[in-house]
Every structure is written in C-alpha cells, then in structure tokens.
C-alpha cells in the first residue's frame, strides 16, 4: 500500500505565493519608469524632428498623399496593446530615419539625438513588453501591426521611387511628425 505524501506545510504555500507576488510586483514596477518619460517623449521628439529637418531649400510640389494611413486602427484603451503598437511604430521610424540616404540639409547631430531618444524609449517599451509577456499570454490582433508595416513599406518605396529627393524626404518628415502625434495619442489614451 502506498504511503500518502506528507501534507505540504501551509508556510510552503505562503512562500510560493509571496514569490509569485514579488515577481509580479517587480514586473509592474519595471513599467512604471515609462510614465514620466511618456509625458515628454512626443513633445521632445517633435522638437528634435523640427530642429533636424528644416524645410527643403526649394519648394516641393504637392504629392498625391502617398501612403495614406487609416489611424482608426490605432484606437485602443489597452495599455499593453498601445505599448506594442508604439514599439512597432518606433522601430519603423528608427529604421527609416537612420538610413544613409537622408538629405544633406538635415542636421545630423539633431537626427542622432532623435534616433537616440527613439531607441531609448523603444528599449524601455521592449523591457515592459517582455515583463508583461511573462505574466500574460494574451495574443493581440495583428491587423494594426500589418497596417503599420504596409504603411512604412509604402514610405520606403516612395523614397526609392523619388530617388530619395529632398522633397520625398520632406514628405517622410511630415509622416514622422504624424506618427509621433499618434504615439502621443496612444500614450495619453492609455496612461490617463
């Protein structure tokens, strides 16, 4: 006859519960560092974008709004969804603005400052997303991310088709400004 296992001491459950609670608390605290940065990221980034990319030396013809974007796909009140979407946008902005074909009239030191700011914020979001991923296995819809990916692919094609001209880059600068405003709205809607 098998001997029943000795009952687990209640303190053992308490230690396990305390360990799980501490891990969840540490993960939640890891995301708190975003809040002060949330308040200034968009404003500071918009200022750096304005400083780095003055208008082109010659007036640009009006483009037929290439790469339009339906921003209603960004509507969410879920903080994790907003963080994931913001992270995706920041990765694309970093990739497009860090390319070697940026116009000569852009101020490189300001561009580097903007890229550093984007990278720091993306890294903070990445850490927060990694921490929240260990707590939650919820899958988020891919539609907003596919739409964002298509939009940035269109911007890359637009630059290529226009030989990376100063006017094409000016259009990209205006789109980058719009994306930073989208990020501001995402953060404001989920952090207030």
From Swiss-Prot:
- Keyword match Glycoprotein: yes
The family database entries (SMART domains) matched by this protein are listed as: IFabd (SM00076)
Question: Cellular component terms, GO, for this chain's entry?
Answer: extracellular space
Q: Where is the signal peptide?
A: 1-30
Function comment: Has antiviral activities.
Task: Cite a single GO MF annotation.
Answer: cytokine activity
Keywords per UniProt = Antiviral defense, Cytokine, Disulfide bond, Glycoprotein, Secreted, Signal
**Where found in the cell?**
Secreted
Name of the protein in its database record: Interferon
Q: Which Pfam families match?
A: Interferon
Which cysteines are cross-linked by disulfides? 31-128, 60-154, 67-167
Instruction: Please list the GO biological process terms of this entry.
Output: defense response to virus; immune response
* Cited CDD domains: IFab
Specify the superkingdom: Eukaryota
Give the source species. Answer: Meleagris gallopavo
Task: Extract the coiled-coil ranges from the record.
Answer: none
Carbohydrate attachment sites?
70, 77
Family indicated by similarity: Belongs to the alpha/beta interferon family.
């Amino acid at each position: 006859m098998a001997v029943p296992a000795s009952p687990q001491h209640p303190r053992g459950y308490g230690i396990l519960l305390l360990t799980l609670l501490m891990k969840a608390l540490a993960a939640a605290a890891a995301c708190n560092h975003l809040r002060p940065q949330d308040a200034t990221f968009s404003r500071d980034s918009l200022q750096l974008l304005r400083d780095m990319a003055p208008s082109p030396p010659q007036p640009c013809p009006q483009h037929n709004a290439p790469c339009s974007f339906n921003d209603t796909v960004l509507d969410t009140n879920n903080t994790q969804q907003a963080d994931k979407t913001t992270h995706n946008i920041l990765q694309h902005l970093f990739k497009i603005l860090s390319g070697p074909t940026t116009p000569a009239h852009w101020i490189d030191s300001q561009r580097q400052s903007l890229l550093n700011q984007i990278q720091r914020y993306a890294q903070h979001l990445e850490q927060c997303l990694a921490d929240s991923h260990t707590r939650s296995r919820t899958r988020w819809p891919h539609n907003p991310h596919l739409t964002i990916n298509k939009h940035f692919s269109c911007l890359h094609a637009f630059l290529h088709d226009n030989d990376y001209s100063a006017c094409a880059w000016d259009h990209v600068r205006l789109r980058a400004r719009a994306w930073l405003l989208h990020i501001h709205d995402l953060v404001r809607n989920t952090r207030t």
